[in-house]
Amino acid sequence: LGTPQLARILHPFVGVVMFASFIIMFFRYWHHNLINRDDIFWAKNIRKIVVNEEVGDTGRYNFGQKCVFWAAIIFLVLLLVSGVIIWRPYFAPAFSIPVIRFALMLHSFAAVALIVVIMVHIYAALWVKGTITAMVEGWVTSSWAKKHHPRWYREVRQKQEKSSE
């Protein structure tokens, strides 16, 4: 179906589309992913979380989910910047060989790191029952929300009660 040459040609363009998609997500969700005191409490109690105990008054996203968000954004920015530097024949001639070599190493590191983040994200989603539905279909049951994200559950319920008045 495809050739290595075609993959090499398409790779940078697919990367730009991927980056643009994540930037849209960034502007949509950044304010939900700001780290607060409750997140620090969550992180300090990671051992309890690993054995499926709920800790803290978690909002829409827990500390782990926020870390995935920020890591994805940071690694995608690194991929974009390094990718532009190594993008032949368009931009690479503007940079020295040492800069291109550094960009290649940075690009490889950021790609592997992002893949690891995505794998951890998928594993965690499989680990916590009901999370795959949230990721794939975009909704969760009220009992799931109440158990895993109690502050967010209360906020949504308050909005529903106000809108029904």
What spans do the regions from the language model cover?
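Membrane-embedded alpha-helical bundles that constitute the cytochrome b-like, heme-associated redox core
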Residues: 1-165
